[in-house]
Amino acid sequence: MPGPRASLPSLSAVDNVCWRCCSSSSGRPVPGQRLRGFAIANQARPLSTSPVRPLRFGATTTVRAAASQSPRPNGAYFLSNVLLERFGGFQFSPRSRAIAGTSGSNISNTKRNATVAAADIPPSTSTPRPQVDEELPPHRRRQAARRTAEQAASASSNAPSEAAQTTPVTPPPAAPSGEIPPDASSILSNAAAAQPAQSLRRRLTTLLALSKPRLTMLVVLSAMVPYALYPVPDFLTPGVSAPSLSPLTLLFLTTGTTLCSAAANALNMIYEPKTDALMSRTRTRPLVRNLVTTRAAVCFALFCATTGILALQFGVNPTVAFLGAANIVLYAGIYTPLKRVSALNTWVGAVVGGIPPLMGWAAAAGESAVGDGSWRELLLAPDGSSAGGWLFAALLFTWQFPHFMALSWGVRDEYRAAGLRMLAWTNPARNARVALRYGLVFVPLCVGLCAVGVTEWSFAVTSLPVNLWLARESIRFWQTQGAAGSARGLFWASVWHLPVVMVLALLQKKGMWGRVWRSVFGEPDLDDDLASDDGWEYLDESEEPPAVTTRS
């Protein structure tokens, strides 16, 4: 039952009201002498039947929107402010009561108006949405939901191995567009955890994850390309009178390099499982998730190291075997512990990346060695034939810096939390300068490969676009200090740069297309012409031929 109505004002208090407007708002003619009849008519037929929405204090725009939904002007609109203040905000419709109830803090007699509004308006049954959802834009809400899902996935990935063996582990969600995606070891660890316990496939996948397959593949390719580009007359064709490259040597080179790289990567994971657990890219690696024991990982690393060094020793030459062993020691014994001590670890890691090209070049040089085949002849030849190997080593050494500086920038906070000293957080300005400095060296390095006779001069032209692309991204990374997506742009430019340069060098090896042309069209070789003239005797035309006498 509605509460008591407020007493009606006298005619003298409402003498400023336009009765013609009041008559049009009520919908029928109302005598000017009967104000009560006008109020009762408006209460009997409300101006709006839409549900009442709760209002917030200070939300003037919401009040205007609610008033604009009514098809007719409210009758209270034509009363003076003095009249409303005198009678406590007397209202003509339920909507007006709701408005007066929310703004009653500024009007007298608020307690009585609140009682009337509560009696006339039914309680709302709808649940209001949280204020956070109303204020945040849609893409911010999606990012918050994605972060919540990632936190739940990381919490489940750190569970004990027994739980992983009983229930399949789903891979974590894809990384946001601004982050570096997880490495191959983390992806393989998720695949191994989804396999049945004690299965052969689970064990093999776990061991493959220990070897860091993507990094190992890059190391092997960086050794194969210099081996194939070594300047010899014949390409993968056995010969007796001329030096050549042997497919069997190439097989031992790739096998030994793969095993040495797998051993170094496994030892790296054995050394820092606690550090890997603190970083998003490495928190799902095998040792972090207890997919393999430390003892089994050590046995795997020792087996790969021993087998790889022996394959290089007996299948290639002792110089290449020494370089493979040095690569393991530098990466697992010096680079990995140095990451907690000094930012110079990046330069040590770059030296590790420059060793595989020297291994490939020394393997090819051993096939055509004419001396004792020592490391001086293979790597420091007096005639300068080893310059191509050192240029390839410099190319891989230089490439490490723009690639890693961009990669570490995206996870610099995680490096700091893990206690790994990287320039990305210890000295961001120097981090950008180093990336710029080494990003501008690729053009002269490619020209140097043409100058020493490893590739054709066309290689300097065809490699120019990709070199300029990397140089531009390095300049942008330096100018913005890694902001505005420059770090990610430099990272992907470096990812594409190295394979493109290697493929272009292989396609433009010095003299390769000339030999292909002669083999297809059968044009005579200059050496063949000289050899065919050895049995002929040439006479000097200036000399007179001997006189021939005949007897008559």
Curated annotation (Swiss-Prot):
EC number: 2.5.1.141
Record keywords, A-Z: Heme biosynthesis, Membrane, Mitochondrion, Transferase, Transit peptide, Transmembrane, Transmembrane helix
Database matches in PROSITE patterns: UBIA
Pfam families: UbiA (PF01040)
Source taxonomy: Eukaryota, Fungi, Dikarya, Ascomycota, Pezizomycotina
Membrane-spanning parts: 215-235, 245-267, 296-316, 318-338, 346-366, 387-407, 441-461, 487-507
Reactions mediated catalytically: heme b + (2E,6E)-farnesyl diphosphate + H2O = Fe(II)-heme o + diphosphate
GO cellular component terms, A-Z: mitochondrial membrane
Gene Ontology molecular function: any one: protoheme IX farnesyltransferase activity
Keyword Transmembrane recorded: yes
Name of this chain's protein: Protoheme IX farnesyltransferase, mitochondrial
Family listed: Belongs to the UbiA prenyltransferase family.
